[in-house]
């Protein structure tokens, strides 16, 4: 599942612009008692790094 997330391209919106990017890192964030989400880290063409939730996990 991790390779699917890292090899897929996602649409990231930042500063009013939209980018189609591949994540450089992804991880699961799941607080106790709540459904988890997959957060991915993206590097924009201008060098900035942004995070985005790319998937929600079932409870």
UniProtKB/Swiss-Prot annotation:
In its record, the post-translational modification comment is: Methylated at multiple sites, to varying extents.
Subcellular localization, as worded in the UniProt entry:
Chromosome; Cytoplasm
Q: Name one GO molecular function term.
A: double-stranded DNA binding
Q: InterPro entries attached here?
A: Cren7_sf, dsDNA-bd_Cren7
| Keyword DNA-binding in annotation | yes
> Where the protein is mainly located, per its record?
cytoplasm
What's one GO-annotated cellular component?
cytoplasm
| Keyword annotations | Chromosome, Cytoplasm, DNA-binding, Methylation
Role summary = A chromatin protein, binds double-stranded DNA without sequence specificity. Constrains negative DNA supercoils.
Q: Which family does it belong to?
A: Belongs to the Cren7 family.
Q: How does it assemble?
A: Monomer.
Protein's name according to its UniProt entry: Chromatin protein Cren7
Top-level taxonomy: Archaea, Thermoproteota, Thermoprotei, Thermoproteales, Thermoproteaceae
Name of the coding gene: creN7
